[in-house]
Amino acid sequence: GASSGIGYATALALSKAGAKVAIGARRVDKLKQLENEVKKNGGEALAQKLDVTKKTDCDAFVEQTVKKWGTVDILVNNAGLMPLSFVKNLKVDEWEQMIDVNIKGVLFCTAAVIPHLKEKKSGHIVNISSVAGRLVFPSGSVYCATKHAVTAFSEGLRQEFSARSNIRVTCIEPGVVETELLNTITDESLQS
């Protein structure tokens, strides 16, 4: 998601470096802010509403990008949720939501872009995971599992494409970053 935090900052930095950025998230108002900021700095942006839990949205996002600019060079999979809670609290709906966004979102967006990268025989897929994928903590069991899945998927995909394909896969595992991600914590005992 490009509407806040790491995704917002990444899109802005890429645009300042000269990249045309297709930006997606569920919150269109935040996307429009980013689109305006990119354009104010002389860059090009295409803001599109995107729900990464829907494969059709991911496919349409990539197709609209290709329609506008003719190609996709880089995919940054950044959408994520972190509604921390202890497993014993059985917030199963939150577990499903994290799996849908944090894992399926990466899979669906990657699936949408791979045919284009294979056709042009180059590209870069960047998956934003978390150090939590390697360092599990109480109340983060499910979140950590989703981030471990992103890390494992990234490594497998990197090996599948190998150096001969000219398609690179990078997994970034940031530590704690003060973003709106913290606002998705619903367990009151963990919000302080």
Task: List where the protein language model places each region.
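Active-site helix of classical SDR
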Residues: 110, 146
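Active-site loop immediately N-terminal to the catalytic Tyr-X3-Lys motif
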Residues: 88, 135-141
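Conserved glycine-rich Rossmann-like NAD(P)H-binding loop of the short-chain dehydrogenase/reductase
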Residues: 19-34
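Conserved glycine-rich cofactor-binding loop
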Residues: 3-4
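Substrate-binding pocket helix/loop in short-chain dehydrogenase/reductase
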Residues: 86-87, 91-99
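Residue(s) in the substrate-gating loop at a strand-loop-helix junction
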Residues: 130
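The beta1-alpha1 cofactor-binding region of Rossmann-like NAD(H)/NADP(H)-dependent oxidoreductases
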Residues: 28-29, 50-60, 92
